Structures are given as C-alpha cells and as structure tokens.
Amino acid sequence: MSDKIAAIATGRARTGIGILRLSGDGCIEAAGQVFRLNSGRPLSSLPDRKLALGTLFDAQGRPIDHCMAFISRAPHSYTGEDTAEIQCHGSPAALTAGLEALFAAGFRQARPGEFTRRAFLNGQMDLTQAEAVIDLIDAETADAAANAAGQVAGAIRKKIDPIYDGWVDLCAHFHAVLDYPDEDIDPFTLSGYEASLTASSRQLTALLSSCRRGRMVQSGIKAVILGSPNAGKSSLLNRLSGFDRVIVTDIPGTTRDTVEQTVTLGRHLVRLVDTAGIRDTQDVIEKIGVDRSMEAAKDCDVALYVLDNSKPMTEEDRRAMGAALEAPEAIAILNKQDLPGAIEPSDLPFSYIVPISCKDSTGFDLLEQAFDMLFPDDAPCDGSLLTNARQAGAILRAKKSVDSAVQSLRAGMTPDAVLVDLESAMDALGEVTGRTMREDITNRIFERFCVGK
C-alpha cells in the first residue's frame, strides 16, 4: 500500500467545488510538484489540516486553477497514510488536467473504495465503519444519516468487541486447562461458562432484534398498494411521488405489473409498490399481474388498501381487502373524498382508516400520521440499529454457534467439542468487524464504493 494514489473525489460533473484526493507514502512531496503555495514555501511545510491558497499546474507546467489545499500526515489521517486534498473549481476539464498532472508526478488512479480500504487495512476503522460510510452516502432521510453516522463512529464495533474479547478469554482459559492439566490453573466451572455464553447470546439477540427497524430506516418501509381496479391505486402512487410515475386511465386493468417508487412521507422513507387491480380476469397477462399483487401483500411491511369511497363495496374490493389483511400491518385508504360517500368506515376491519382525495390532494397529512403510529420513532437512530444484511448474517451464525456451545456444555460434552462451537462463533463474529478477515468479503464490500472514497 506504499504507492501513491489519486482520484477526483467529487466526480466529473460540473460542480461549484471539485476535490482531488491523494494518499500514500511521499504523496505530500509529490503533490508539491503540481500545486504551489502562493507563499512560495513547499506544500510539505504546511501544518496538518490547514487550508492554504495556491496554484494547480498541468503536466506541461501551465496554470490550471487558483485553489486551496491541505495535508494530513500519517497516522492522523483518514487512510492512516500521508494524505492531501486539492480543492478546485468544479470544472471537469480542470480536474482531469490536474489528475493527469498527478499521474505524471508518480501517482496512479485510485480504485473504487481504495481510500477507505486503506483506512481499514491501516486500522483506522473496522468493516462496520467502512460499510457505514456507504450507508451515510446513500442515506435518504435524517434518521438514516444519523444511524449511519453513529456506525461510522463505531457504534456496532463497541457492541461486538466486548463479546468477542470475552470469548477470546474463555477460549484461552479453556485451552490452558486442557493443555496443562498438571498446572495450578483456576478451573472455570461449567456453570460459569454457561452463564457467560448465555449472556453473550442474549446480547446478540438484542442486536439482531433491531434489524427490521434498521432495514426500514436505511432502505425504506415497503408499502404495497392493493385494491380493485380503478380504486385510485396508481393515482395514490403518483400523488405521493410528486409526478406521474404510472399511467392512469378509466380503463380497468391499466396497471398489469408491479411498479415501484421510493418516496419520503414525513420522516419515513417508503418504498411504494403499485400493483394490478385485484379481480377475476380472463386476460392472461393481467391474471399474472393479479397473482403478483396477492403475493406482494405477503412480502411487505404495510399494505395500503385503497377503496373508491364513492361506490359500495364489491366482491373484488372484499378480495383485495382479504389480501391486505394478510400483511403485517394494513391501512385502509378511502379515496375520492371529493365525491359523495357510499362506504361506512366503521364497517371496515382496519385499525387505521384514512380518508383522502387524490384529486384534491387532501388527507395525506392523515396518512403520514398513520405511518407515525404504525412505525414509531421508538429506538434512537444513533448507530445501534443493525442495517447491514452481511453483518446480520454473520451475527446470526455466531449466535447459533454459541448456543450450540451452551447446549454442548449442558449435555456434558467434552471440552474439545465445546471449543469447536465457541471458535466457530468467534470466526463468525470476527467477520462482522473484520477481525477474522476474508478477502472475498472485503473485496465485495469495497467494490460498492465509488472512485475517490
């Protein structure tokens, strides 16, 4: 990792400010070949993290831009290496010329995620923090950003490390008793082992219990829109999206497949799924769409059951209602409140009933309130919510192995058998933070990053 890398950290689109990011042994001195301080002093004379004005030159020595730069010396930098940033005006041409000048000065193009990979390999962060960097970049709500920021600061690592370290101590003591039976080593009672391992299993269970809310905070609440044809499902999707995402006509069966759109509803990130109207049909394509509608209700966080409030309920409405009631949560939406009503809300078996008019855009504040009640902000988004499927899978494997170790203890199995389970648990838990590192896992993680991060 001693080679010098460089990248445009802000992308190649026109922006107000563009940043060239550099890292590696000797990068500060090499950067001084293309960026010269107005003071005439070398770039390496700057104190850490102090912006200074200067001029960026291209590979032929021609001035490109008047800009700012700062340096950070190892190990007190993002990557743990000597680093520098040159902040220019965001001209793609100027940034490209500056990058080519850096290549001529001995830098190479950074690979996607290479700055953060170096931070991980140099011990500046663990894998949970590295993955949280991506989550922070992708965050679409304040809650998602706050939770990711907490994980960048090490919230998950602070929960995992004490458990892992406790298992290391148990393994070491177990090995000592097994390997040196004649030594005067304080024996660790079986009940002591069992209590310790059971406590750590409970801690992992508590961490896993945050997965559902963590997924909804980071990726969105999956809300499937169900109803009979022409109830206003697609109109609801369009109104919440703020634009015409799907075609709306008076012809039943216009929507024949699921259509997804992510929207923000108050503090909630919601992944809306519009579905085909549920009815009996001889049209082969529409029938496939209806079947998908029924299946979608089983794979969501909440069903939004849309009814045309201006007409009495039909058998098609009741069939759609049955599908909605199979969802984990459901909200009945009485659409077309701009017309005289024909449905009595008290006849509907729903805890949440929201009257709206997609035509007049009324009642959507009530829909937001229903989401607030169904998905309360009852857990702090401080980084403690588990949002990452890879991490959750590894924690679940660790829990299964430690539970197996407890069962082995209770069954009177030999210490060697217990150790097999415990060391398997350690391997799995170590994958969460990267203490037990697999190259295929780290490659997959850092491939998700953009160039310059």
In which residue ranges do the predicted regions lie?
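Generic enzyme active-site microenvironment
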Residues: 272, 306, 333
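Switch I (G2) and immediately adjacent beta-strands of P-loop GTPase domains
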Residues: 53-64, 69-73, 253-281, 299
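Glycine-rich, N-terminal phosphate-binding loop of Rossmann-like dinucleotide-binding domains
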Residues: 22, 88-90, 240, 275, ...
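Conserved catalytic network of the ASCE P-loop NTPase/AAA+ motor domain
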Residues: 12, 62, 76, 126, ...
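A glycine-rich (often HGG/GG-containing) alpha/beta subdomain
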Residues: 1-146, 150, 154, 331
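Inter-motif core of Ras-like GTPase G domains
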Residues: 286-310
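C-terminal-of-GTPase-core extension/linker across diverse P-loop GTPases
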Residues: 3-8, 12, 142-264, 281-283, ...
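Short alpha-helix of the ABC ATPase nucleotide-binding domain corresponding to the H-loop/switch region
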Residues: 278, 286-290, 318
